[in-house]
Amino acid sequence: MREPAPGAEPVATPPASHWFIYMVRTASGLLYTGISTDPLRRLRQHQSGKGSRALRGKGPLTLAWQQAVGEKGAALRLEYRLKQQSKAFKEQLLTQPERWLACSQSWLATAQTQKRPRYAAAKEGSDNRECQRQVD
């Protein structure tokens, strides 16, 4: 590894496992949720038609929201839970970002205590009330 030139700023090394959860807004106002290590790169892929099929032909796309979540496993669990939420809940998340911390912590804690087979997973919406109570 090369040493930086004298007087040069050291280059920060990104964390080994730094994942983001993000939402992309389509031209018609739909919100798409995904995960990536680089949301801006992923947005460019979606815009070029090389990303998710769900976004192909949906007009101009904008990155509406992104949040660092750490490890890939946590990102996958949070993406799964966020995709289950209503559009109204997601819109509130965009305008009230403090809600994310309460919900993500609750969802990850629930995932740790409820280890169950994938086929047994049911749509879980009851955590929304807990998230709202924690934020209010």
From Swiss-Prot:
TM helices/strands, residue ranges: none
SUPFAM superfamilies (alphabetical): GIY-YIG endonuclease
Ranges annotated as biased composition (Basic and acidic residues): 124-136
Residue span(s) of domain GIY-YIG: 17-92
Family statement drawn from the similarity comment of this UniProt entry: Belongs to the UPF0213 family.
Region annotated Disordered, chain positions: 114-136
Name of the protein this chain belongs to: UPF0213 protein AHA_3736
Gene3D superfamilies: GIY-YIG endonuclease (3.40.1440.10)
